[in-house]
């Protein structure tokens, strides 16, 4: 496993990129972890298959690390997938799009956040994050055939109105964004949050197998079985 690399220059972006490979049947999950309070310790995931096709989920601020990794490993970026439209999960969209011209996908009810700095909460961070890349919207149950294994879209309105999870059934992997976090859940007091829809959204996740591996938008990975035991919200 390659050593974690940390910038030693105050002029460069402060980032720690974890090249920890998780082999799960037909796919490999590579977490890119951006450790900076300004970006709320957001996680980015690169998922690739045996044919060197890959997708990036929630590109945070580790722009060059993602680009370098994809180029160094001769990967073909098929798509940029967004679990929701908050600024800390979409900052890297334009950089990746300009580098690879990959399709961008987001939940239908979160599409407005890509072009609205209030809705995507970047104004709260004293910034104005806007995505210029073209994008397509996703609906519940939609299947994406981007990798060797299909990716299913599960809508989970709660943290935002258009939050979605990405589920790879054969590998039993779920990318939850800020819906489920390690031993907790995302906030429900931000613009477009739908707290009243939490239980209906959670019921979709609870229907998945207990051994489902969970990769959230912040924090460490977990499993649905563990979250059922220790997370008071996963009931």
State each model region's role.
Residues 120-123, 143, 150-235:
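Metallo-beta-lactamase
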Residues 15-16, 26:
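Generic short N-terminal amphipathic or hydrophobic helices
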